[in-house]
Amino acid sequence: MRPSKRRPDQLRSVQITRHYTRHAEGSVLIECGDTRIICTASVDEKVPLFLRGKGQGWLTAEYGMLPRSTNERMQREAAKGKQSGRTMEIQRLIGRALRSVMDLTKLGERTIQVDCDVIQADGGTRTASITGAFVAVHDAIGTLLRKQAIEATPITGHVAAVSVGVYEGVPMLDLDYLEDSRCDTDMNIVMTDDLGLVEMQGTAEGMPFSRNDLDMMLDLAQQGIRELIAAQKNALNR
């Protein structure tokens, strides 16, 4: 039995609230169980130097955690004067995931800046950030379309992410913090709505996992991502 009492193939409850903040072109609060993240997408009318004059846009992401988003207060990274390797890894993952469903040539020479700020953490913050940020980006693109700043949407499909793992020998979907801290294997999967794999990050924390375990985890992730994309579509239709 999982500590959360969920079935091995059961997601935590998911709630996506759009237009959560006033100023950003796209903003979302995503709640996955007790994990809560504010995702915003802002439009910047310029591109990085390496893209100037090339007629295409860019999307990049930043990620951070509030000091008391966890059980014990963390020092702000700004106070330390540098980002941790974990933070840099996660924000690059978010950017790659979102760019996988963008035709940046349709964006023009502008940048979508995504910010994912964890206000409460209970596992799965990087995967929830991707799932929520997609909706924020969708709304930011909607703003550009309404302003006639672009002629067509650059979004080519949906993308979402979920964690899977092996806990006490059983492959499981959507690990919370307690499960993640005790699992034998931890893996993050990013997929599109046509079930294309964007990224897999997996590590055996204790015993190595088998090919059969991997196949079972991929099946669980595919099921979970279908449900998460359905939640995205439901939020966008409200």
UniProtKB/Swiss-Prot annotation:
One of its GO terms (biological process) is tRNA processing. This is Ribonuclease PH. It catalyses: tRNA(n+1) + phosphate = tRNA(n) + a ribonucleoside 5'-diphosphate. GO terms for molecular function: 3'-5'-RNA exonuclease activity; tRNA binding; tRNA nucleotidyltransferase activity. It comes from Nitrosospira multiformis (strain ATCC 25196 / NCIMB 11849 / C 71). Keywords: Nucleotidyltransferase, RNA-binding, rRNA processing, Transferase, tRNA processing, tRNA-binding. It is an enzyme of class 2 (transferase). NCBIfam families: RNasePH (TIGR01966). Signal peptide: none annotated. Homohexameric ring arranged as a trimer of dimers. Belongs to the RNase PH family. Pfam families: RNase_PH, RNase_PH_C. PROSITE patterns: RIBONUCLEASE_PH. Phosphorolytic 3'-5' exoribonuclease that plays an important role in tRNA 3'-end maturation. Removes nucleotide residues following the 3'-CCA terminus of tRNAs; can also add nucleotides to the ends of RNA molecules by using nucleoside diphosphates as substrates, but this may not be physiologically important. Probably plays a role in initiation of 16S rRNA degradation (leading to ribosome degradation) during starvation. PANTHER family: EXOSOME COMPLEX COMPONENT, EXOSOME COMPLEX COMPONENT RRP41. Its EC number is 2.7.7.56. Phosphate binds at R86, G124, T125, R126.
